[in-house]
Design a protein with these regions (language model features):
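Conserved Rossmann-fold NAD(P)-dependent oxidoreductase catalytic core, especially the SDR/UDP-sugar
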Residues: 61-104
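NAD(P)H-binding glycine-rich loop region in Rossmannoid oxidoreductase-like domains
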Residues: 1-64, 69
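Conserved beta-loop-beta element that borders a ligand/cofactor-binding pocket
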Residues: 82, 114-138
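Glycine/proline-rich active-site loop of Rossmann-fold NAD(P)-dependent oxidoreductases
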Residues: 110, 123-125, 135-146, 179-190, ...
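Amphipathic terminal alpha-helices
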Residues: 258-267
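Conserved C-terminal active-site "lid" loop/helix of NAD(P)H-dependent oxidoreductases
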Residues: 201-205, 225-254
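A conserved pocket-lining segment of Rossmann-fold NAD(P)-dependent short-chain dehydrogenase/reductase
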Residues: 127, 147-168
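Mid/C-terminal beta-alpha module of Rossmann-like enzyme folds, strongest
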Residues: 176-231
């Protein structure tokens, strides 16, 4: 609510909706210049397969609703996909041409990508897909997952920590959306990540060093699965070493914070 009030003070008109109730948002589409779909269904507690199915149900319903509405009134749609669509590729560099073999967190988005791209080709849906890495910035999931757990003495590296994570500062992600909404590169996908993917252990160490805290240890994946859920852990231990060259080349995008170490002081 406070965030909404802050936006209203900036002149933003809010339209509050429910992902599972299309009537609460589909009528807004004809009134805007473009639709940017960044919504994700929120769940609480341990991530189970059933909860992942709830996330997929919500995303499928909202994405299909928005794509139909955008087709009906010829509006541009920016769809937020994600790097989990690619699945585990070890040390290999991943580009937009890399085949999708999603980890659990990427299954719903992959399903929608496979629907949206044919709609772009065959029915001329004006859609552009953005695939952000793990987003960090003040507050949000980053604060919950890293800062809060570190303060409680609960932060741990998942498994061996040798898998790559590709990340992005929230301000750089916003800049990419601003460029994409002005683009006419319909049917294209852009990976939005910084210049330096990090192994998970290095990412966590960079964070604890910046906080002036003692480096943390690792936790076995089997124990993590008991605590937070198998599908989530299977996603977080995948290796996604993502290239951002296409977004730089075609959108003219350049991350202000090219590495995690550069961006942390601003957080």
């Amino acid at each position: 609510v406070r965030k909404g009030q802050a936006l209203e003070q900036l002149g933003v008109t809010l339209a509050v909706g429910d992902m599972l109730k299309p009537v609460s948002y589909e009528g807004v589409v004809p009134t805007v210049d473009a639709v940017i779909h960044t919504a994700q269904y929120g769940i609480q507690g341990r991530f189970t397969r059933k909860k992942f199915e709830q996330i997929e149900q919500a995303d499928v319903l909202m994405t299909r609703t928005l794509s139909r509405a955008c087709l009906a009134c010829d509006k541009k749609l920016l769809y937020t996909s994600g790097v989990f669509n690619y699945g585990d590729h070890g040390d290999e560099w991943i580009t937009e041409q890399t085949p999708l073999r999603p980890s659990p967190l990427g299954e719903a988005h992959t399903k929608m990508v496979e629907e949206l791209l044919p709609l772009s080709r065959e029915q001329h849906l004006r859609v552009i897909l953005l695939s952000p890495g793990f987003v960090y910035g003040p507050g949000g999931l980053f604060k919950q997952s890293f800062y809060d757990t570190l303060q409680k003495g609960q932060l741990r590296i998942f498994g061996k920590g040798q898998n790559y994570w590709s990340i992005i500062h929230v301000d750089d992600l916003a800049a990419a959306y601003a460029l994409a909404v002005e683009s006419e590169a319909y049917g294209e996908t852009y990976n939005i990540v910084d210049d330096q993917p990090l192994r998970l252990c290095d990412l966590v160490n960079t964070f604890t060093d910046a906080m002036g805290k003692k480096r943390v240890g690792a936790m076995a994946t089997w124990l993590l699965k008991l605590l937070i859920g198998g599908p989530l852990v299977d996603s977080l231990v995948t290796s996604f070493r993502i290239s951002n060259e296409k977004a730089k080349r075609e959108l003219g995008w350049q991350p202000r914070y090219s590495t995690f170490k550069d961006g942390l002081p601003e957080v």
